[in-house]
A protein has these predicted regions:
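Helix-rich "cap/lid" substructures immediately adjacent to catalytic or cofactor-binding pockets
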Residues: 43-71
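A short glycine/serine-rich beta->alpha loop
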Residues: 32-41, 70-77
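ATP-dependent small-molecule kinase catalytic core of the GHMP/sugar-kinase superfamily
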Residues: 1-10, 96-157
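DPxDG-like acidic metal-binding loop motif
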Residues: 75-101, 117
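N-terminal, positively charged, Ser/Thr/Ala/Gly-biased leader segments
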Residues: 1-34
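Residue-level signal for inorganic ion chemistry
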Residues: 17-19, 47, 80, 147-148
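Solvent-exposed beta-strand sheet faces enriched in polar/charged residues
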Residues: 22, 32-34, 66-68, 107, ...
Length: 157
């Protein structure tokens, strides 16, 4: 079984898919990375924690997770939280775990207060530490978004 999550970036007039998270069968659990540097110990990576969290409750086969990091560390954009949430979603799909959206949210909350935001497939307003979510009627259709990463570290821990 193989799973991957592709992020689609609008560049010019086209949309270009970039595989940002890939999960493949392996003899033992492993994490590999490419793209931007990810500081810290591998065991502290939220993708690793997401796998081990689900492994406590489900009989998961060993896998290799490959993460292509495109959101800068410390940007305050929830890059690690989104990686964790999408790992949960992808594992749920690949292993046919049939975890409900509500339970995925509960698992995500154990990984970080803003991880639940990335389980949702709609625009949400996050308040508190990011754990209180309210749907809002908003679309990015026909809008441009500019994201600026100043030369400062924004910790979301």
């Amino acid at each position: 079984r193989l799973g991957e999550l592709a992020a689609f970036l609008g560049i010019g007039r086209g949309h270009h898919g970039i595989v940002v998270l890939e999960i493949i069968p392996a003899d033992e659990f492993a994490l590999s990375t490419s793209g931007l540097d990810i500081p810290g110990d591998v065991s502290e990576n939220l993708c690793v924690k997401a796998y081990h969290l689900l492994k406590k409750d489900f009989d998961l086969d060993p896998i290799k997770i490959h993460l292509h990091k495109i959101i800068p560390f410390g940007a305050g954009l929830g890059g690690g939280s989104s990686d964790a949430a999408h790992t949960l979603r992808l594992l749920n799909s690949i292993f046919s775990l049939e975890i409900s959206q509500q339970m995925l949210m509960a698992y995500a909350a154990q990984l970080g207060s803003d991880c639940t935001f990335f389980i949702q497939d709609r625009v949400m307003l996050g308040t508190g530490r990011g754990e209180i979510l309210t749907p809002i009627p908003f679309t990015l259709k026909d809008k441009y978004v500019v994201i600026v990463k100043p030369d400062i570290h924004v910790s979301t821990k």
